[in-house]
Amino acid sequence: MTGINPIEQAADLKQYALIQDIGEIFSRPNFVEKASVNFAGDDGIKLDNIIGQYQFRDKVKCGIASCGTKHAKGYIASLSNGQEIMMGHVCGKNNFGVDFTNKEKEFRALRIHADQFHALKAAYEQLEASRQVFEHTLQHTGKLSFVEIKNGIYGLVGGGLSYWITQTIKNKVSSLGMIFEEVPKTDEEKAIERHMKGDESSDTQRYVRDTKNILVAEIENFDVVYQWHEAEKLKDYFEKIHREIRNPVGMPDDVFKKLVKRLKDYDQNLQELRRFCVRGNKLLKKDNLIKLTCLFRHSDEIRAIEQFAGKYG
């Protein structure tokens, strides 16, 4: 498909929707329950096109008179005499071969295209509401807005504190927010370790470290610090796509396809952006940040952390 979107030229976009009510088919003016179809030669009634798709809970008979196989899903087929019949998807392949397969592929492509057209048209019609949801996510997901979280993260590891304090936080706090302290092992612990290594001989004792690391604090959601660039990408995604969304009528097909592809990630990206804002708010809480004081011994460093954490009390 090239040029202008072909779906908008269709007489009725609804024809591509999956039919689940058999009454919709029976009410069609050209529908017949059974027709004698000629599969070879030039004479007789031929398959014209596939014009609809259905799926029912109960099985129905194929409309090809010589077939009659029961099936639950299939297609509405138009015939060369203007009539329409129901045709099982397997029946069509068995009776019409490549011709049916090609028409089936074409119909499916048109149906997918129609669904995409409707999705983009709905996105265009709901654009203002979508913008408001996006802005609400940035501003009101928690106590702190997106920008305030961004500034808080910068203040924590980007320059809001002294160089020494910042480097200590970066070096001593793991990416998951764990803070460990190195402490001496007891003689009993070292003896147990040697025993576990299977070497208790005083002459050939293997090296056993005299110290161990113990967890002294955990900064909740600290990994947001190192993932915040992803939040910025999500924000950029919404700002850009809100500028790009427009009425698909008359839209060049290459632009249409590109926008539809980007739009598929909209809901998932919104959830991810909201998650970043929620977790950023949990990170920047006084009782969470105050745990960083365990990294420092000097009163001025501890005071600096307390003052920083106090801004989020």
How should these model regions be labeled?
Residues 153-225:
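Charged linear interaction tracts used for macromolecular binding and regulation
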Residues 1-71, 76-77, 83-86, 91-101, ...:
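N-terminal cysteine/histidine-rich coordination modules
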Residues 115-146, 206-313:
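Extended, amphipathic alpha-helical scaffolds
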Residues 14, 34, 46, 59-61, ...:
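Context-gated lysine
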Residues 8-9, 14-20, 80, 86-184:
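Domain-exit/linker segments immediately C-terminal to small folded modules
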